[in-house]
């Protein structure tokens, strides 16, 4: 992550040796790191003064509109303006090991003329700098590659679905409370099992304001904030050590379920103690919700309209065909307020919307930005993605979710005579070929025999193709897990997967 403009102030309270005031040039990233010996409390007055201010995204929209108003004849101009910040706390052995408090702001400007695109950005909202960015974007048009599909998004008449993205309680949450909460998560986790150590306990939150305006008529602005906690564990038994982890997310810290996160992190590690390498065979796998989320993340690239148009997806030419078990309905729904990545607009300012990608096993659509839609002769699905003011729009899924079933994970496991419960995978993204669909990934978990969890296993791989996996799904859990990612987790049962061990 890069932070383009940062202003920080830390007051000299207990454990902080002296006050520090920093004004950082563009491109720098500020970390305040406190050792176990000195870090006890951080003054949150400065941070809360930013986090609790009224919505200033309309100020950003005024800036964007002023830029767009300077468009010359024959130009399309887009101004994307944002401001945001984050807090990150890491606790180890009851003390603050790492603390980050940072803010950034900036503007990115696209200019399109005669099929060529120029782009420039700056990590400041200084008026002179903005004028320079616009001039640079115009100059960069000359270096752009001619593209018949180049252009900005235009209003498409799809109405936004009102959502609440800003939580005042989170905005006012004191830094000292964030630290106390992180320490409490560590304490709870340590109390779950005497064999468990906590590698790190973390609290993370962020806030952002954004505005986008274009010469094509888009005018949008808004703000949001979010938070989550995570904990990583180590379980020891003699010379053996196994790892675990867990998350909890919420609109505000009061929604965290710390006992659940602590229990899951401890169980993930202790369950694997004594794990052996399993025999190789074809078997049924039960994917833990976190693993399902990872697979959906990989699958999302194959449903990307731009990748499809470039021949980078095995779903090319499959629209209208059965590509999954009839139980499968897969949606991309950033309008669901429970999704961690919920939003009301995409990266181009179009309304976010619920898109049904696969319905009852049939491939219905691909996600599109305005650019990929022009390439494929379709319409934008409100799926433009953007990494911030320093980047131009891409395309991708925003909040994927499988339509859940009704059974719990325990009930699904009871229905498996012989299989393996996959608790963790390693190297999944690098182990998948999105064109052929082939995948092979390292895994660890628990064997299942006669519907009961048996011995732990590790150092094996599972392999199949994504196409085959979608068709071989035999059960879907109702245990939705809202993770801090673009894909929601739940338990999946898949037959006939190759497990390679000894």
Positions of predicted regions on the chain:
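Low-acidity, Ser/Thr- and Arg-rich intrinsically disordered low-complexity segments
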Residues: 2-7, 11, 18, 23
């Amino acid at each position: 992550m890069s932070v383009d403009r940062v202003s920080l102030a830390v007051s000299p309270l207990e454990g902080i040796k002296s006050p520090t005031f920093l004004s950082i040039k563009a491109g720098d990233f500020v970390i305040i790191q406190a050792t176990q010996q000195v870090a006890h409390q951080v003054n949150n007055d400065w941070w809360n003064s930013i986090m609790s201010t009224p919505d200033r995204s309309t100020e950003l929209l005024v800036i964007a509109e002023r830029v767009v108003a300077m468009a010359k004849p024959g130009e399309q101009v887009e101004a994307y303006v944002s401001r945001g910040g984050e807090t990150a706390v890491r606790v180890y052995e009851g003390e603050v090991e790492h603390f980050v408090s940072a803010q950034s702001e900036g503007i990115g400007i696209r200019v399109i003329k005669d099929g060529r695109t120029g782009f420039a950005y700056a990590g400041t909202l200084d008026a002179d700098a903005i004028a320079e960015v616009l001039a640079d974007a115009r100059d960069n048009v000359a270096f752009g590659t001619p593209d018949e599909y180049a252009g900005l998004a235009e209003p498409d008449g799809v109405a936004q679905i009102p959502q609440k993205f800003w939580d005042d309680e989170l905005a006012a949450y004191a830094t000292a409370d964030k630290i106390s909460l992180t320490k409490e998560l560590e304490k709870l986790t340590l109390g779950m099992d005497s064999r468990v150590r906590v590698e790190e306990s973390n609290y993370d939150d962020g806030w952002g304001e954004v505005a986008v305006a274009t010469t094509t008529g888009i005018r949008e602005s808004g703000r949001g904030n979010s938070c989550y906690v995570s904990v990583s564990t180590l379980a020891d038994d003699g010379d053996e050590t196994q790892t675990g982890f867990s998350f909890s997310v919420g609109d505000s810290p009061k929604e965290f379920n710390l006992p659940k996160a602590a229990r899951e992190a401890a169980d993930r590690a202790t369950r694997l103690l004594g794990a052996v390498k399993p025999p190789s065979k074809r078997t049924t796998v039960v994917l833990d919700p976190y693993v399902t989320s990872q697979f959906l993340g990989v699958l999302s690239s194959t449903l990307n309209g731009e990748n499809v148009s470039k021949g980078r997806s095995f779903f090319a030419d499959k629209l209208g065909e059965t590509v999954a078990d009839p139980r499968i309905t897969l949606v991309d729904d950033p309008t669901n307020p429970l999704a961690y990545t919920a939003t009301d607009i995409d990266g181009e300012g179009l309304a976010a919307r619920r898109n049904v990608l696969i319905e009852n096993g049939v491939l219905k659509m691909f996600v599109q930005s305005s650019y990929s839609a022009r390439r494929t002769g379709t319409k934008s699905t409100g799926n433009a993605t953007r990494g911030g003011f320093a980047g131009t729009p891409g395309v991708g899924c925003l909040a994927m979710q499988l339509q859940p079933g009704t059974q719990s994970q325990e009930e699904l496991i009871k229905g498996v005579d012989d299989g393996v419960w996959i608790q963790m995978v390693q190297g999944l993204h690098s182990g998948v070929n999105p064109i052929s669909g082939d995948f092979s990934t390292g895994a660890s978990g628990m064997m299942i025999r006669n519907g009961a969890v048996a011995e732990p296993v590790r150092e094996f791989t599972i392999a199949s193709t994504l196409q085959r996996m979608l068709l071989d799904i035999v059960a879907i859990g109702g245990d939705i897990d809202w993770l801090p990612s673009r894909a929601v987790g739940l338990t999946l049962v898949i037959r006939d997967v190759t497990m390679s061990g000894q």
